[in-house]
């Protein structure tokens, strides 16, 4: 039934102008179709409402969305992959001014805690569905979704919030509160263990003073570690 074109377990979404549910700007419910089609439909709707910040560096345009698209997809996969389909009702997604909430029916599988899933422990009430999602490439590794979401916010002051009740599971993701420069430096450190001031100057197209200001602020905030090596100073993520 879940993979048929007549799956009745829809996803209902609403957009709000602020951080309350007093009034909404728009609503949408996915069509009665397979959970995979509903996943893609919901993703497209959220993506349309995911604002993008942009910066021009030389001839390049750097774009940073308010919400990481991989995080959105992981949250959607979690809602359809682990919900309790014995409980009738729709998955709910609330798009607020500063956050998005994904609320699915069914609490944690017996024996698991929030701390367990944050470090990657996995147990599903829908093993066949998860297996299909894995074979189709939607799920890369069992139990990796929540840890990947948390890792994305490693440099952010605001962190995702998980609330579990006996019959529901909510994950709330905040807007990424990092500026474009900080996000660019973070992405640079994904492929490089260390960086130098000169790397930042070239990547961001800025002068020495501006590069040092950004790096020093990230060191003060505890995001980066500064390592003096004689004439060379390098920076790395503070794990």
Put a short name on every predicted segment:
Residues 1-239:
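C-terminal regulatory or interaction extensions
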């Amino acid at each position: 039934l879940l993979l048929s074109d007549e799956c009745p377990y829809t996803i209902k979404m609403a957009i709000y102008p602020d951080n309350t549910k007093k009034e909404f700007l728009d609503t949408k419910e996915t069509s009665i179709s397979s959970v995979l089609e509903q996943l893609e439909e919901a993703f497209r709707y959220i993506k349309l409402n995911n604002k993008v910040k942009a910066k021009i560096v030389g001839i390049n345009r750097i774009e940073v969305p308010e919400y990481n698209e991989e995080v959105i997809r992981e949250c959607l996969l979690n809602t359809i992959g682990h919900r309790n389909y014995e409980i009738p009702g729709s998955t709910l997604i609330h798009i607020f001014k500063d956050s998005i909430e994904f609320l699915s029916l069914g609490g944690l599988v017996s024996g698991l805690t929030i701390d367990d899933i944050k470090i990657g422990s996995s147990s599903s009430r829908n093993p066949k569905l998860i297996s299909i999602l894995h074979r189709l490439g939607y799920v890369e590794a069992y139990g990796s979704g929540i840890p990947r979401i948390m890792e994305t916010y490693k440099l952010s002051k605001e962190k995702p919030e998980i609330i579990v009740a006996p019959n529901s599971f909510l994950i709330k993701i905040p807007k990424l509160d990092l500026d474009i420069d900080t996000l660019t430096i973070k992405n640079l450190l994904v492929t490089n263990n260390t960086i130098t001031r000169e790397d930042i100057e070239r990547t961001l197209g800025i002068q020495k003073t501006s590069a040092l200001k950004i790096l020093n602020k990230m060191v003060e905030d505890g995001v980066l570690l500064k390592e003096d090596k004689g004439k060379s100073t390098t920076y790395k993520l503070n794990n």
